[in-house]
Design a protein with these regions (language model features):
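Short, ordered beta-strand-loop transition motifs
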Residues: 9, 473-474, 691-696
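A general secondary-structure junction signal
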Residues: 56-58, 108, 443-445, 528, ...
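Short intrinsically disordered coil segments
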Residues: 69-71, 406, 419-423, 666, ...
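Generic solvent-exposed, charged/amphipathic alpha-helical segments
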Residues: 90-93, 426, 430, 512, ...
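Inter-lobe coupling/hinge segments of SF2-like helicase ATPases
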Residues: 208-222, 230-661, 700-701, 733
Length: 742
């Protein structure tokens, strides 16, 4: 740190500063002559101290010079923000209609003055989260121990009655296996809690493995190189299991060999180490990881290494903000994934599209990859903005998993259902387990049941802060709000009349319970937001678990050798969403899940249980849906939805619903008056499906904008109107602008 109060008498260098605040202007300060653009300096602003970034030097102030303050110090211990970073921030602020200060805060969330405090807070949260996961894991292990004890008792009883030597030998072997499993469970139960402050560190590998491609991969690889050489982003449309990762690795290795850095974006690397392990095998110490689960200290270490070295950086969307230099290649894996979109706080950016802009800033090639590309990326290929490369051949198995649609209404009529499982699916699971395979079951809701209802008066317990029902979590015996976290103990009795509360619907906890009852000899695990994801994935990957029940986390890019059957329960909840993207998302979810099985030679099986077997989504899954896909695009064109238009959502919140309705209506009228009604459409205000969260009522206004030369100007008009609306009224609510909402 360099301090210099009173040292600027000879030369007054007026600078403009970016502060980590929602400011629509950049304040002026006086600084020493040697301050450069991108330097970080400490200043006082509105009675508080901040670390800002110098955006301009030697400017002519448009205000009274006597009111301009001097900076407190130059933070010489903090690295200078590069010109490339500043360009990216400016683009994001303009495109996503936020302030550059909000982008700065996202890029450097732990400024010098708050890093220590933030590190303590995050460490505390990590400890609390680890304790909760530990309790869940202990509960699961105790239940598993009970099931193994029960199976062991049955086997020993059968052995005592057995007469044939062959039967005795088989039972003896099974007993030994169960005893080994029991000892392993007991060891886990007695093991000390892991050190939450300690993070996994990949061991050095001086001999990274070489990547060998199949003929189909070689062709795709060559086509990608041709496309990247042409200066356009490339979309690799490759079926699940086709070996896209191997192509990424080869391209990344070539970039490193040219002295370039590589950014490899993945939707959720914090959950599974599978991808990190594969990339570590390929790149050894040339691999850096960056994601939200890391401590601030680890993030700073990664950032420092990147500033001075050549690396492949594996990260989530936040890795876009790293101080990239000599960037040669950006890979966006699973580019369709919704987790690339930042929901809150600002900037509410789309990581995939921001990656394309980052590539343009650095002159780097951009490769998007997916087995189920987004409509936006497919449309960009049709219009010539992107180049598409297809990879239709699976690496180990030439065929997709066999699809079976089971009509649950028909099965229920003929008594073919046991709880939430059809007898047909039960038989498929038994067959798979008997052949030594594994099973994954998707249920797109966590908890035991999404709601409970009084059998006497019909009351459904709701969150006192949100307009939603409370979900029943049987393991913790609590009713929990999945929006704000509010919870109350579950007593089983109605608070109004004292009647019995009945669980309605089924979440992953209930499905797990049903699976354990149907297959008592199977080893069952659950993967959702309430379980220890890394531990569950590891045990399933190494074969210690037979059946995995999970939410949509199980559809992500895992690679399990023995997984040969995947099944979707209650699929109607996935295909019946009220959104213009509902069918697209359903197809992506199902195809991604389908691709998890049959990845090592044998053909897998994909079973969907639904009450709507003729839904267009299932026609698409059967491979005969090009006409349906074209129809979906025609509908979007007709009603003005992406990819043919741009959407902007204005989200208004207030604790007073009446006041909110009044101001939201006024806002909508002003927007409609300010935009050309012949080409722009203002819809609303309307209440979303969940119209109250954390004691705030919500209204939305949706704006459809044509993708023409006036798009930027119209978006600026929207931003200006919202700013004026916020500052010219005595309204205590707040407004959010969401560009390209999902």
């Amino acid at each position: 740190m360099t301090t210099f109060a009173g040292e600027m008498a000879d030369e007054r260098n007026c600078i403009k500063l970016i502060l980590p605040l929602k400011l629509n202007w950049e304040p002026y300060y006086y600084a020493p002559a040697d301050v450069k653009r991108g330097d970080r300096v400490s200043v006082h602003f509105s009675g508080r101290q901040y670390v800002g970034v110098v955006s301009q030097v030697r400017v002519h102030p448009q205000t009274d010079p006597s009111k301009i303050r001097e900076i407190d110090s130059i933070e010489t211990s903090l690295a200078r923000v590069s010109a490339g970073e500043l360009r990216l921030w400016a683009f994001m602020a303009e495109y996503y209609l936020c302030t550059i200060g909000e982008v700065y805060k996202a890029a450097y969330p732990y400024g010098k003055l708050s890093e220590e405090k933030a590190a303590v807070l995050i460490a505390k949260r990590r400890e609390e989260s680890a304790a909760r996961r530990r309790a869940e894991e202990q509960d699961r292990l105790l239940r598993l121990q009970g099931r193994i004890d029960e199976r062991l008792g049955r086997r020993k009883a059968s052995l005592a009655k057995a007469r044939k030597d062959s039967v005795k030998d088989r039972l003896t072997g099974e007993i030994k296996q169960l005893e080994c499993e029991l000892e392993a469970v007991k060891a886990k139960l007695s093991a000390p809690a892991p050190d939450t402050a300690k993070e996994e560190i990949l061991d050095a590998d001086p001999n990274p493995t070489e990547t060998k491609l199949s003929p189909a991969q070689e062709k795709a690889y060559a086509d990608i190189k041709t496309g990247l050489a042409g200066g356009k982003p490339v979309l690799l449309n490759g079926v699940t299991g086709s070996g896209k990762t191997e192509i990424y690795i080869k391209l990344a290795r070539e970039a490193l060999d040219r002295g370039k850095n590589v950014l490899y974006l993945s939707p959720g690397i914090a959950l599974s180490s599978q991808l990190a392990d594969r990339l570590h095998d390929a790149f050894g110490n040339d691999l850096l990881c960056f994601h939200s689960a890391q401590t601030p200290a680890r993030k700073r270490e990664t950032t420092a290494k990147l500033r001075s070295g050549r690396y492949v950086v594996l990260g989530t969307r936040s890795a876009l903000f790293l101080p990239h230099h000599d960037l040669g290649l950006i890979i966006v894996d699973e580019e369709h994934d919704s987790s690339y979109k930042q929901d809150s706080p600002a900037p509410r950016y789309q990581g995939r599209d921001t990656a394309v802009m980052l590539g343009s800033i650095h002159g780097a090639g951009v490769l998007l990859g997916s087995a189920t590309p987004s409509m936006e990326s497919l449309y960009n290929c049709v219009t010539g903005r992107y180049r598409m490369v297809e990879l239709r051949e699976r690496y180990f198995c030439s065929e997709d998993a066999e699809l079976q649609i089971i009509n649950t209404l028909a099965e229920r009529r003929k008594n073919g259902m046991v709880g939430n499982f059809s007898i047909k699916l039960i038989e498929e699971i038994r067959k798979t387990l008997s052949e030594g395979g594994q099973v994954a079951i998707l249920r797109a809701r966590r908890a035991y049941s999404p709601l409970v209802q009084c059998e006497a008066c019909g009351d459904i317990p709701k969150c006192i802060h949100c307009n939603v029902s409370l979900s029943y979590h049987r393991i913790s015996s609590r009713l929990i709000c999945h929006h704000c976290g509010y919870s109350i103990p579950f007593s089983g009795s109605c608070s109004l009349c004292g009647g019995s509360l009945k669980a309605l619907g089924a979440g992953t906890q209930k499905i797990e319970e049903e699976v354990q009852a149907l297959f008592p000899d199977a080893r069952v695990a659950r993967l959702d937001a309430d379980s220890d994801g890394r531990s569950v994935v590891k045990t399933f990957s190494d074969g210690s678990t037979d059946i995995l029940v999970g939410t949509q986390i199980v559809t992500k890019g895992f690679d399990f050798d023995r997984l040969s059957l995947v099944a979707v329960l209650l699929a109607d909840s996935i295909i019946s969403q009220q959104d213009f993207r509902a069918d697209e998302r359903a197809v992506q979810t199902f195809e991604q899940f389908r691709g998890r099985c049959g990845r090592r030679g044998s053909r897998g099986k994909f079973v969907i249980q639904t009450s709507q077997p003729t839904h267009p989504v299932y026609t698409l899954l059967k491979g005969g849906g090009q006409e349906i896909m074209n129809g979906m695009l025609d509908e979007r064109r007709q009603f003005g939805y992406p990819p043919f238009t741009r959407l902007v959502n204005i989200i208004l919140r207030d604790v007073n619903e009446g006041r909110l309705v009044k101001f939201a209506g006024e806002m909508a009228r002003k927007l409609a008056a300010s935009l050309d009604g012949n080409v722009c459409q203002v819809v609303g205000p309307f209440a979303p499906l969940v119209d109250k969260v954390s004691d705030e009522f919500i209204r939305r206004i949706r704006i459809h904008l044509p993708k023409d030369q006036s798009l930027t100007k119209r978006k600026a008009t929207i931003a200006s109107l919202v700013r004026d609306f916020e500052t010219s009224r005595s309204w205590i609510g707040h407004i959010v602008i969401d560009v390209d909402p999902l």
